[in-house]
């Protein structure tokens, strides 16, 4: 394996739902790849009330449990938040800050142009962006490949119905 990319939602809103975090982190740290294991945050990588896959509005500010970050460090996973790494002087890997969580945490999310402007355009640019909503902007900014998650391939009800009745494939969302 050359590179492992995890496009968000490593956690399901509750750190305590991990039965044995140390054991799971040890297992993940066993992933061997030539260039490393990288991730970006997803919209479920925060402490938030959830039931049957749906979150509920909260009055308090939604925050990321600090144990998530400690877990990733223990697991040997490098988190990229609107950050870029040049890998082996051969290509760039960009990890985006999740758009929903950036709003909740009152953080700025860079534009694709801001991210790619300082990069050497002769090298390929691979982006991990949990929510695949800005593909045209990514393409216009020189992104060659966008790796996303979030859609669950339309496998969660009622998203299955949306896919059926809209005539769109899950990738089109």
Predicted segments, located by residue:
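Soluble catalytic domains of enzymes that build or remodel membrane lipids, polysaccharides, and related
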Residues: 1-173
């Amino acid at each position: 394996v050359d590179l492992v990319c995890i496009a968000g939602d490593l956690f399901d809103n509750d750190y305590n739902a991990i039965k044995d975090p140390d054991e799971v982190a040890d297992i993940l740290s066993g992933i061997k790849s030539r260039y490393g294991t990288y991730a970006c945050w997803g919209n479920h990588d925060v402490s938030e009330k959830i039931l049957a896959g749906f979150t509920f509005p909260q009055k308090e500010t939604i925050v990321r449990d600090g144990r998530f970050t400690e877990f990733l460090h223990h697991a040997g996973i490098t988190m990229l938040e609107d950050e870029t790494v040049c890998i082996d002087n051969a290509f760039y890997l960009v990890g985006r800050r999740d758009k929903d969580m950036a709003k909740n945490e009152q953080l700025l999310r860079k534009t694709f142009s801001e991210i790619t402007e300082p990069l050497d355009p002769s090298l390929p640019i691979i982006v991990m962006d949990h929510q695949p909503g800005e593909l045209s902007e990514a393409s216009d900014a020189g992104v060659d490949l966008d790796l996303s998650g979030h859609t669950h391939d339309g496998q969660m009800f009622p998203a299955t119905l949306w896919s059926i009745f809209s005539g769109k494939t899950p990738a089109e969302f």
